[in-house]
C-alpha cells in the first residue's frame, strides 16, 4: 500500500468514526417510528400532481421532472420552531440543471427560508447547496461535496430551528450552523414557515453557472422521499410558546453543538466544503456581519 492509498483509507475511516461518534440527540428524543408516519399525515401535493407517485401505502413518495413540469409538496402546517427531517434519494447519473430541494420557507417578499438544494451534475458527485434567507435577503450560500453518492440510497437530511440556532444535518452530521445573533443587530428567521420539497428545472443557474443544461432525452428524472414526521411547534400555538423549553428542541442542550458534533462539523468544513459565501472576496469585499459568529 502506497502513502496516498493509506491516507485515502485513513481519511475515510476518520469520517466513519465521526459519524458513529457524533451526538445524534435530535434523532433519539423524537421517539416516533418514522416508518409509521405516512405522507398524507403531514403533507399535501402542491404542484405537478401528474408527476407525484405515492408508494408503499404512502410511506414513500416519488417526484418526477419531465419537459412539461416538475413537482412538489409542502407541509399542511406552519411552524415557528422545530426539528424537521426527511429521507431523500436524488435522481442518478447525468442530472445537469436538475434541482432537488428540501427547505423551510415563509411567504411574501420579506420571507425567511432555510434551504437544502441538491444541484444536479454530469456524471459524478453533485453539489449540495445550503442557504439562509432573512426578511427576503439570501446570498448566504455554502456548498459541499458529500462523502457518499446521494443517488445510490436514502440518506437523512434535517433542519433544527430554535431560538438559539439553525443547524442543518446530513445523516446526523452537522453541515451548517446559523446562530441567532439578533442581540448583535443581525436578522434571524422568525416568521412562520412550512416544510417544502420539490424537484424542478434549475438549468439557468444550477450546474456550471447555467452552462450545462438539462438533457431531456434522459427524462423523466425521479427523486424519492421517505420519513414524513415533523417535530414542530404550530403557528397557531399560544403567543411566544414556540420558543418554550417545554419543546425538546428548545432546551439548553440544543443551544449549541455538542463536543462530538462540533468535531464532526469542523471535519466537514475542512474536508468537504468547497464554497462559503463568507470567504468570497469577489462578492463581498468585507465579509457579511454574521460570518464571524457562524464560522
From Swiss-Prot:
It is found in: Secreted, Cell wall; Secreted, Extracellular space, Apoplast. The keyword Transmembrane helix does not apply. Its EC number is 2.4.1.207. The gene is XTH1. This is Putative xyloglucan endotransglucosylase/hydrolase protein 1. Glycans are attached at residues 180, 215, 229. GO terms for molecular function: hydrolase activity, hydrolyzing O-glycosyl compounds; polysaccharide binding; xyloglucan:xyloglucosyl transferase activity. Coiled coil: none annotated. It comes from Arabidopsis thaliana (Mouse-ear cress). Xyloglucan binds at residues 117, 129-131, 139-141, 204-205, 209, 283. It catalyses: breaks a beta-(1->4) bond in the backbone of a xyloglucan and transfers the xyloglucanyl segment on to O-4 of the non-reducing terminal glucose residue of an acceptor, which can be a xyloglucan or an oligosaccharide of xyloglucan. The active site is at residues 113, 117. Residues 27-225 form the GH16 domain. The record marks 115 as: Important for catalytic activity. Contains at least one intrachain disulfide bond essential for its enzymatic activity. GO terms for biological process: cell wall biogenesis; cell wall organization; xyloglucan metabolic process. One of its GO terms (cellular component) is apoplast.
Amino acid at each position: 500500500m502506497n502513502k496516498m492509498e493509506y491516507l485515502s483509507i485513513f481519511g475515510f475511516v476518520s469520517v466513519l468514526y465521526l459519524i458513529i461518534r457524533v451526538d445524534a440527540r435530535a434523532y433519539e428524543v423524537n421517539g416516533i417510528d418514522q416508518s409509521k408516519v405516512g405522507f398524507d399525515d403531514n403533507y399535501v401535493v402542491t404542484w405537478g400532481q401528474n408527476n407525484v407517485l405515492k408508494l408503499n401505502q404512502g410511506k414513500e413518495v416519488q417526484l418526477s421532472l419531465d419537459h412539461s413540469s416538475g413537482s412538489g409538496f409542502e407541509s399542511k402546517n406552519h411552524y415557528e420552531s422545530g426539528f424537521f427531517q426527511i429521507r431523500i434519494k436524488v435522481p442518478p447519473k447525468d442530472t445537469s440543471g436538475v434541482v432537488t430541494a428540501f427547505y423551510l420557507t415563509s411567504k411574501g417578499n420579506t420571507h425567511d427560508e432555510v434551504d437544502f438544494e441538491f444541484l444536479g451534475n454530469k456524471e459524478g458527485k453533485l453539489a449540495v447547496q445550503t442557504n439562509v434567507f432573512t426578511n427576503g435577503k439570501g446570498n448566504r450560500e455554502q456548498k459541499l461535496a458529500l462523502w457518499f453518492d446521494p443517488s445510490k440510497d436514502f440518506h437523512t437530511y434535517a433542519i433544527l430551528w430554535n431560538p438559539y440556532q439553525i443547524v442543518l444535518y446530513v445523516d446526523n452530521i452537522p453541515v451548517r450552523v446559523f446562530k441567532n445573533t439578533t442581540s448583535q443587530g443581525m436578522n434571524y428567521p422568525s416568521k412562520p414557515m412550512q416544510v417544502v420539497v420539490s424537484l424542478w428545472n434549475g438549468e439557468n443557474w444550477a450546474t456550471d453557472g447555467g452552462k450545462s443544461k438539462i438533457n431531456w432525452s434522459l427524462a423523466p428524472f425521479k427523486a424519492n422521499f421517505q420519513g414524513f414526521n415533523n417535530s414542530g411547534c404550530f403557528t397557531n400555538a399560544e403567543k411566544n410558546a414556540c420558543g418554550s423549553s417545554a419543546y425538546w428542541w428548545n432546551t439548553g442542550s440544543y443551544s449549541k453543538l455538542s463536543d462530538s458534533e462540533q468535531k464532526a462539523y469542523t471535519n466537514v468544513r475542512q474536508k468537504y466544503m468547497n464554497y462559503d459565501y463568507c470567504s468570497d472576496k469577489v462578492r463581498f469585499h468585507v465579509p457579511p456581519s454574521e460570518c464571524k459568529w457562524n464560522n
